[in-house]
Amino acid sequence: VKLMFQSAEEIFKGANDMIEHGILDHPRPDAAMAYHMMIGKNQVGTYMYNAGGIMMNSVDEFKITIHGKGTHGAYPHQGIDPINIGVHIHLALQELISREANPQDICTLTIGKFNAGSAANIIPESAILQGTLRTNNVSTRENLLSRMKEVCHKIADTYRGTVEIEMVSTVPPLMCDPQLTLEMAEYMSQIGIEGLKGIPNSIATASEDFAIIAEKIPTTYMILTAGFMDERGDYPLHHPKAQ
């Protein structure tokens, strides 16, 4: 039995690092089991699992660097505005989700950082957008990654700028082994804790680099919900007031 205390999970770097340092060697585990806590006011005391395959989405974290030409805000015609380019790129990427992704697939694209400029009256030299693409469909993932790059370059070219796209990290969908998952769900049902309830066929829109472990050995992954049923449970995961 090996206990894996995974580091760097939030930046999707921990699993690969631990594999490189031999977590799956000497001896090689027969199977892997992972549990992730989740805050959910309406689902406290549940465990979610999926014996049918995909439990969590893939994730591709990207960084888009836009290069323009700095100038005084009073003379925009003398520069190339990277913020303007970034705004158009952000809107266009959302259109990819609403118009090119199959509505039956789980697919989200989020820009979580948009950094540019140092003063209110200066058009800066560059702007940086960072975000994530998540989906449960392999072909959708491949198509959107290709289209993202195409859209970014064409928009930058339209407004006379240039763009660089860096893939910061990539993680596949987390696939659960059906037999192992059903076996563990049965064990959970026998614990005998009052109010503990299993939710089968669950799919989380979040992502987890434990998926890289799941690519190599049979794996089951469960989400355990905890928290409070009163107003303390109103705050979601990653909120500074989450309890």
Label every model-predicted segment:
Residues 84-243:
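Metal-dependent amide/peptide-bond hydrolase catalytic core
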Residues 1-124, 207-210, 233:
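Histidine/acidic-residue-rich, glycine-tolerant segments that coordinate divalent metal ions
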